[in-house]
Regions:
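Short, glycine/charged-enriched secondary-structure capping and boundary segments
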Residues: 14, 35-36, 56-58, 80-83, ...
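Conserved, mostly hydrophobic/aromatic
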Residues: 20, 66, 80, 84, ...
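Surface-exposed amphipathic alpha-helices with a cationic face
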Residues: 12, 30-38, 84-88, 133-143
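Structured helix-beta-strand junction loops
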Residues: 62, 89-91, 110, 142
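Catalytic beta/alpha-barrel core
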Residues: 1-4, 8-34, 39-58, 64-77, ...
Length: 144
């Protein structure tokens, strides 16, 4: 949900979602959504450089998961995931930003939830079955 309006939130409130993944909202807006709609929250923090990293702290009280994504999240852009290496381990982290099959080994010893959405597409918005199969095979090789 990208800065969801009250109308959108009202329309989807009866759908059986466990989490709302929310972009471009302030911590206060996240708190409001969490309290009113009683959903678990994935708060997206966009990262371009190291100065953006500490923005997550304001969202922690209202978020079950913090998603670190690139500034161009709608365009499947990437950011330097190594910026996250010194982050504290006391909260759940999700990473996105055009993660591709070849990137999997970089995350082997990390406690990240990985959003590979754009990295598994041949055409923007359309997943590739062969890329999904290759990704799952790579995951099995790395963790087995």
């Amino acid at each position: 949900l990208v800065k969801p309006s009250e109308d959108v939130l009202e329309e989807i409130k009866y759908l059986n979602f466990d989490y709302y993944q929310v972009y471009d909202c302030s911590p206060e807006e996240i708190r409001y959504i969490k309290e009113k709609y009683r959903k678990k929250i994935i708060s997206a923090i966009t990262i371009e450089n190291s100065q953006d990293l500490n923005n997550y702290k304001d969202f922690l009280p209202f978020s079950e998961i913090i998603l670190f994504d690139s500034k161009g999240y709608e365009k499947s852009m990437s950011f330097n995931h190594k910026l996250l290496e010194d982050m504290p381990s006391n909260f759940k982290k999700m990473i996105a930003g055009n993660i591709k099959i070849d990137d999997i080994l970089n995350f082997k010893n990390k406690e990240y939830i990985i959003d590979v959405s754009g990295g598994l597409e041949d055409i923007s918005g359309k997943k590739s079955k062969s890329k999904i199969d290759k990704f799952l095979n790579e995951i099995n090789k790395v963790w087995n």
